[in-house]
């Protein structure tokens, strides 16, 4: 290839071959990535499972559940998946925080998984003490330094409360909302996230699942179903 006037010739071997080496002679050109493949896979999976996908969910309805103890305040929401399992309704929505630091760190996006059911009656809020992302870890560390001594055990379960922050109106109500089988499951599986239980509603926000796609949503729905069954069983 000739150099433009006034420019030196390119170095030997320029331009470099593409990653993985040059394609063999006569090979067809590589197909461009399909930007809509993930959405089509999601649409097909939702239809197969009998779920409902809503591109314009009601922001005010989600806001009406606040205040929560640990759940992040919503700035906006994206797509919503709905499902019905017996008496329980499931709503999974893309949720975004209005936090510029978290946005830059890629930690402002979450999955809000809300289960509505008349079986839920008692109140408790828990938050894993690790795994919430760098910004949350730093904020929690500074909060611990500034707050000084702990408020004491909320449940009378030091093993559980070593791993989770807990808030509940009373020890009795907290133990009713968080049965031992549910606590053991959370500990044994190394679960990390936020779980808020109140009359008629259970909110789960997993720390390690943020994408709104089939590989993420399938295990998240299974997980929130397990937590609901253990909370009401």
Please tell me what each predicted stretch does.
Residues 3-23, 36-233:
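Charged, low-complexity intrinsically disordered regions
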Residues 28-37:
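A short, highly charged nucleic-acid-interacting micro-segment common to nuclease
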